[in-house]
């Protein structure tokens, strides 16, 4: 079905629109040009990852190697100086695909030149040092480590610097916090008695700020003279000996003081004595000596190497408290401490405003560049410590070899350790770090969103226990930078966020998020100028107008008071005072949220669910783009590189399922350069299009022939005769492609160039009407006009001059690649042979795209009505058509590995001669039918649970008694199986899995000893790829884009489904009660507009928050399109004025109409990754917890199902006493009872039960509360069996506490 792209509102580029006579803001004339909504291009969605990694390569590596390594003893020394300007990268040993298959790192070896120098030697030796294996970011923006795709999250942390916290309303305590880049936090607080305290983690308890200021070298008189309101500090003198607490007196006695310290030395002794008093590990009886106290102070409390503010922290000190220290001085100084004290005193007298801790102005964004730099420094530090330990064991004399410096020989022997420590540190970050995560590859949107995720958790951030409601909340500075909608549900709500579509990380200074704004000059919005990129700090000074204000034709704001944001608060102001205006709604939301049509009609909680569930949609076998979209569907596919695009201009010569070949001109530009001035001048003069954009034109200018072109022909006449075919003007809008500025026919130019260079006997062209084909998916929108399809005769590669005119580019397509979530990714070509493509044009679709658009669901006919209770509580009733026609069928891939191990009795063997037990031989021989002569399953085989995939046997102890009986030995000899004792350890299909064997990969062994002991060409490791085809079934989870989700409860034959007046049966029946309480009305508007699009053969691109163009704009639009569809299709039931948007639907079982009109239409429904095949689980018996002796939980561990309080109530309501008794005893923690139950089942006797361990536990707990519970046993006899059973009787009595004691 061919759909014509239709715009429903103003949009981002010049786009052709169909006539819509609804309300203000919608066009009324066909083919008109709409004004540009904002003149900026959306940044690449994955560049936030690429730029971060590029920053590490360009700047981070050089920064890490600035300082040399120095080692010295009394007689020898060694200096290792790095030259970061000469860093070299070696080509990766494996390609990205090979790294995934072999389980390796897709990385590059890093080398750096180093200079080895010694003070006692005049030689300066330069050599290359192997730094380590650095994982390289792929083109898609992720890493491959150990064969697994991983993505690095961005982290939002607090800026280093100084912060004034608000005074607590109850305790009236003010706090000033100093946050260094390196080192512990410093708190300066004031208590109720106006005493000023200094607190760090090293001191463990707070001390007087006066003492610490004295310790850093500030005299008494300077403190009181330089500080304003310094009288408060007089309350901070410590009490004299005997007037304070006992511990305070101990501190003074140990320091040798009787009162407050008077000198700097006494302050050191007091601080050291205070530390020993409250330290659990220090000797408290030793006196504090001056030298020891001084060393303690400068090594622990005031270590300049640990109190590093960094450039950002120093800048904050200069801006907030007026520090005069230069930016180059990044350490905390005593002047900083004194000015911080002044800031706290000003806060107490209300002369200073507190800082907003949760504002983005106080935070910065860390990417993979900082993380890789940190772990590089960690690896270098580990090597330095390792080398220093080696140095300590060197002899004090010269080396045995002669006069050579022993440090040099030690360096040569251990420099390989440098690369090991650095490589391990980098690998540890990706594999065990919380910020290097297993990439979500469920679909293209999931991958894009995962790479644009931001978290406040992780090392250097906050922990889940420290979170507050303020941290999880939405701050005004999030506007245009972080999406207020998309965040996880549950414990991480508000802690993990997503970047908005237009937000970009700043490149210089503090890594903050910037968002664009239009400049406003005297009330006129400057949309022709590039938007300003504004940081959160700069936004405080702006007066911003919202994006939904209606402008005049000259982009002038209305002359009335307008709603604005001033200092991040809502105000109203006149247009002449406004400085900026927001660029659009995409400025406020993330990528996933922007894909929800009619977002403004949904509750924010449901929009959150819709954003998250789109990431969980499984790619389907037949992907289909939505009828109602928002316009970003192409960008998601294009930016994440999940589609094949042409890298060169040319025409397609060969198309197959595995590759596409494109023939590109090499010297065409040079051969037609003599006509360049003629071509462009003609293009300016000629405005008429060769082909009508709405209908096929067969005018005489449309068809022409060029016959027998000779090299000596009149080229001018030839050119002018074909000028109308060379170029055509696009009448709808200007393309913004990378390789072309106008729509022309370059294939004709290429053919003419061939004619000019040599004779071609005959070449003819003709026009053909062609439906829209996707162009460049990296651009926001594409043309809706019909393109000219040029074909020619006798086009073969031998017709052209080799290596002069054409060059062939081959594009390999990905076939059946497994993702991290076990979904299947494949690329399929969409263009036929002999098709001309431009650079950037789409050649092939991915697993979750159709015609270059994100396609993660299906457009199906839905109806909102209750149906026999089968859609109660969000359950979903679906038609058998969805199963038969594989509408919601998806492909899933799993791989199963098996490797040969080296046992104490020899190597295991992969073979098809497997020793079998005689009791299982018949069944197992049938299960082994797919194995070949090597013991590997054949590719293309259909396998079911229990089938053999790889045959393997493990040797047993030859001296041990045989496990096989004599007749089993004879049986194996007859079948010519192994005579020695082997155990069957083959790889078999797990339970609940069935599918086709897609591939068998023979891989090298990962254990060196196995490879050394094995024979040549022996199979040591095998990976079997299994492809499953899963149809929709009862228990699968489905959802829409508006947070409407449910579980399939029944699959009904299509003849029983409700049907429309034209006889079309409904595909899905949803419960209408799920709409009002959830307040997601957007699904109703989507399904009705989809119904109109289905009958009109149109696709719609809606503009979010379209109420700016008029009241009830969305509803007016839907009704107008339904009315138009009813007129064009001559179906009045599509739009009935007395109940618009509702249809008389017939019951498929009776043929009668339902009592009330039903809302029905085409909605975009997703099939989520929560499939019932992965959830359903049965356990006959299994492992038990060692502590509670109850079944473990989890399907992966073959666990049981926990019965909670409400489940027990449900069974009690039905009077299922025996079922409950069984659940509480033998199926839980009745140790004796479950053993006896097995014996009774074997003996065909009734199952008896005992007392569970949980009952014994509660019995002991009650006895601990002085309840005397006594348990008795009662004998009962069955008529058939004589069986002793235990029946508990509980007499309850109270005892006195004295009796117990």
Curated annotation (Swiss-Prot):
Keyword Cell membrane: no
Record keyword ATP-binding present: no
GO molecular function, one term: DNA-directed RNA polymerase activity
Stored InterPro entries: DNA-dir_RNA_pol_su2, DNA-dir_RNAP_su2_dom, DNA-dir_RNAP_su2_hyb_sf, RNA_pol_bsu_bac, RNA_pol_bsu_CS, RNA_pol_Rpb2_2, RNA_pol_Rpb2_2_sf, RNA_pol_Rpb2_3
The reaction(s) this protein catalyses: RNA(n) + a ribonucleoside 5'-triphosphate = RNA(n+1) + diphosphate
Enzyme nomenclature, EC number: 2.7.7.6
Pfam families: RNA_pol_Rpb2_2, RNA_pol_Rpb2_3, RNA_pol_Rpb2_6, RNA_pol_Rpb2_7
Keyword annotations from UniProtKB, A to Z: Chloroplast, DNA-directed RNA polymerase, Nucleotidyltransferase, Plastid, Transcription, Transferase
Domain of life of the native organism: Eukaryota
Subcellular location: Plastid, Chloroplast
Enzyme class, broadest EC rank: transferase
Gene3D superfamilies: 2.40.50.100, 3.90.1100.10, DNA-directed RNA polymerase, subunit 2, domain 6, RNA polymerase alpha subunit dimerisation domain, RNA polymerase Rpb2, domain 2
Recorded family membership: Belongs to the RNA polymerase beta chain family.
Main function: DNA-dependent RNA polymerase catalyzes the transcription of DNA into RNA using the four ribonucleoside triphosphates as substrates.
Name by which UniProt lists this protein: DNA-directed RNA polymerase subunit beta
């Amino acid at each position: 079905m061919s759909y014509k792209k239709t715009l429903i509102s103003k949009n981002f580029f010049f786009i052709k629109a169909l006539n819509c006579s609804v309300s203000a803001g919608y066009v009324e004339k066909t083919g008109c040009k709409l004004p540009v909504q904002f003149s900026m291009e959306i940044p690449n969605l994955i560049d936030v990852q690429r730029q971060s990694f590029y920053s590490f390569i360009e700047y981070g590596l050089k920064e890490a190697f600035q300082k040399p390594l120095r080692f010295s003893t009394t007689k020898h020394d060694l200096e290792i100086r790095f030259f970061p300007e000469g860093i070299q990268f070696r080509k990766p040993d494996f390609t990205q695909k090979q790294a995934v298959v072999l389980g390796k790192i897709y990385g590059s070896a890093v080398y750096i030149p180093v200079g080895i120098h010694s003070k006692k030697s005049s030689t300066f030796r330069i050599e290359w040092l192997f730094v380590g294996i650095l994982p390289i970011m792929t083109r898609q923006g992720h890493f491959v480590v150990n064969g697994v795709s991983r993505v690095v999250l961005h982290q939002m942390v607090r800026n280093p610097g100084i912060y004034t916290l608000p005074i607590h309303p109850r305790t009236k305590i003010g706090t000033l916090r100093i946050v260094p880049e390196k080192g512990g936090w410093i708190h300066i607080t004031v208590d109720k008695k106006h005493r000023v305290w200094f607190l760090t983690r090293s001191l463990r308890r707070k001390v007087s700020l006066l003492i610490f200021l004295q310790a850093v070298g500030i005299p008494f008189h300077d403190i009181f003279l330089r500080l304003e309101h310094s009288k408060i500090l007089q309350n901070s003198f410590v009490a004299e000996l005997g007037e304070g607490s006992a511990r305070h007196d101990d501190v003074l006695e140990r320091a040798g003081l009787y009162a407050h310290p008077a000198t700097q030395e006494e302050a050191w002794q007091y601080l050291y004595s205070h530390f020993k008093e409250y330290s659990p590990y220090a000797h408290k009886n030793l006196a504090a000596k001056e030298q020891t106290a001084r060393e303690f102070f400068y090594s622990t409390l005031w270590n300049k190497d640990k109190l590093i503010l960094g450039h950002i922290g120093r800048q904050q000190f200069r801006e907030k408290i007026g520090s005069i220290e230069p930016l180059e001085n990044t350490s905390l100084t005593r002047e900083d401490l004194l000015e911080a004290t002044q800031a706290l005193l000003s806060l107490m007298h209300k002369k200073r405003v507190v800082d907003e801790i949760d504002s983005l102005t106080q935070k910065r964004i860390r990417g993979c560049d900082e993380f890789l730099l940190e772990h590089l420094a960690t690896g270098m530090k580990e090597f330095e410590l390792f080398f220093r330990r080696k140095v300590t064991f060197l002899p004090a004399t010269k080396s045995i070899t002669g006069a050579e410096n022993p440090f040099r020989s030690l360096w040569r022997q251990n420099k390989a350790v440098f690369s090991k420590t650095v490589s391990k540190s980098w690998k540890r970050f990706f594999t065990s770090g919380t910020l290097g995560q297993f990439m979500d590859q469920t679909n293209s949107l999931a991958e894009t969103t995962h790479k644009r995720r931001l978290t406040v958790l992780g090392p250097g951030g906050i922990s889940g226990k420290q979170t507050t409601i303020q941290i999880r909340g939405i701050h005004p500075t999030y506007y245009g930078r972080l999406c207020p909608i998309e965040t996880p549900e549950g414990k991480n709500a508000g802690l993990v966020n997503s970047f908005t579509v237009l937000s970009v990380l700043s490149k210089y200074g503090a890594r903050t998020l910037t968002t664009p704004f239009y400049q406003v000059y005297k009330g006129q919005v400057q949309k022709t100028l590039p938007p300003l990129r504004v940081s959160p700090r700069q936004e405080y000074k702006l007066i911003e107008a919202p994006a939904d204000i209606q402008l005049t034709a000259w982009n002038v704001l209305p002359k009335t008071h307008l709603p604005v944001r001033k200092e991040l608060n809502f105000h109203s102001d006149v247009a002449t005072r406004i400085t900026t205006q927001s660029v659009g709604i995409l400025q406020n939301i993330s990528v996933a949220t922007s894909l929800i049509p009619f977002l403004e009609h949904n509750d924010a909680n449901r929009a959150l669910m819709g954003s998250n569930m789109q990431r969980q949609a499984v790619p389907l076998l037949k992907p289909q783009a939505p009828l109602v979209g928002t316009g970003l569907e192409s960008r998601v596919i294009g930016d994440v590189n999940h589609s094949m695009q042409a890298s060169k201009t040319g025409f397609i010569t060969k198309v197959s399922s595995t590759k596409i070949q494109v023939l590109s001109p090499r010297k065409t530009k040079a051969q037609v350069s003599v006509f360049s001035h003629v071509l462009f001048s003609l293009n300016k003069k000629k405005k008429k299009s060769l082909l009508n954009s709405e209908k096929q034109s067969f005018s005489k200018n449309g068809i022409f022939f060029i016959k027998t072109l000779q090299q000596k022909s009149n080229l001018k006449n030839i050119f002018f005769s074909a000028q109308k075919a060379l170029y055509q003007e696009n009448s709808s809008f200007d393309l913004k492609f990378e390789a072309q500025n106008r729509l022309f026919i370059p294939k004709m130019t290429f053919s003419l160039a061939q004619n000019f260079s040599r004779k071609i006997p005959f070449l003819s062209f003709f026009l053909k009407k062609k439906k829209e084909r996707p162009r460049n998916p990296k651009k926001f929108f594409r043309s809706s006009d019909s393109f000219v399809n040029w074909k020619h005769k006798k086009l073969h590669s031998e017709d052209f001059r080799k290596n002069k005119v054409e060059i062939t580019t081959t594009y390999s397509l990905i076939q059946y690649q497994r993702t991290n979530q076990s979904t299947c990714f494949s690329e399929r070509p969409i263009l036929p042979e002999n098709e001309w493509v431009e650079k950037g044009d789409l050649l092939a679709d991915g697993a979750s795209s159709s015609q270059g658009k994100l396609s993660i669901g299906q457009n199906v006919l839905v109806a909102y009505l209750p149906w026999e209770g089968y859609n109660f509580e969000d359950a979903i009733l679906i038609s058998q058509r969805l199963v038969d026609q594989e509408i919601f069928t998806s492909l899933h891939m799993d791989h199963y590995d098996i490797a040969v191990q080296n046992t104490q009795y020899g190597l295991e063997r992969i073979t098809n001669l497997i020793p079998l037990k005689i009791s299982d031989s018949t069944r197992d021989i049938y299960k082994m039918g797919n194995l070949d002569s090597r013991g590997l399953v054949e590719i293309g085989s259909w396998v079911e649970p229990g089938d053999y995939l790889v045959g393997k046997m493990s040797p047993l102890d030859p001296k041990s008694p045989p496990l096989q009986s004599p007749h089993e030995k004879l049986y194996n000899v007859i079948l010519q199986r192994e005579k020695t004792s082997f155990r069957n350890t083959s790889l078999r299909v797990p339970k609940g899995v069935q599918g086709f064997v897609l591939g068998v990969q023979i891989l090298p062994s990962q254990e060196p000893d196995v490879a050394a002991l094995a024979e040549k060409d022996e199979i040591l490791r095998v990976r079997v790829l299994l492809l499953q085809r899963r149809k929709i079934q009862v228990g699968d989870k489905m959802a829409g884009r508006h947070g409407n989700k449910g579980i399939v409860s029944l699959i009904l034959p299509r003849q029983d489904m409700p049907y429309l007046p034209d006889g079309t049966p409904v595909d899905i029946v949803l419960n209408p009660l799920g709409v009002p309480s959830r307040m997601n009305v957007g699904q109703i508007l989507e399904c009705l507009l989809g119904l109109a699009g289905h009958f009109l053969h149109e696709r719609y691109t809606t503009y979010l928050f379209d109420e700016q163009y008029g009241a009830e704009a969305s509803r007016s639009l839907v009704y107008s399109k339904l009315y138009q569809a009813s007129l064009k299709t001559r179906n009045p039931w599509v739009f009935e004025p007395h109940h618009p948007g509702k249809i008389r639907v017939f019951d498929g079982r009776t043929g009668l109409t339902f009592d009330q009109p039903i809302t029905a239409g085409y909605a975009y429904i997703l099939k989520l990754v929560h499939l019932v095949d992965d959830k359903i689980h049965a356990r006959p018996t299994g492992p038990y917890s060692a502590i509670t002796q109850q079944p473990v939980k989890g399907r992966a561990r073959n666990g049981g199902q926990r019965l909670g309080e409400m489940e027990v109530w449900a069974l009690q309501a039905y009077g299922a006493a025996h079922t409950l008794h069984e659940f509480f005893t033998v199926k839980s923690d009745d140790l004796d009872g479950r053993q006896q139950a097995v014996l009774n089942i074997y003996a065909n006797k009734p199952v008896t039960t005992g007392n569970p361990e949980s009952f014994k536990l509660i019995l002991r707990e009650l006895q601990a509360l002085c309840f005397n519970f006594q348990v008795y046993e009662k004998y009962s006899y069955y008529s058939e069996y004589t069986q002793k059973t235990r029946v508990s009787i509980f007499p309850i009595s109270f005892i006195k506490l004295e009796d117990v004691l």
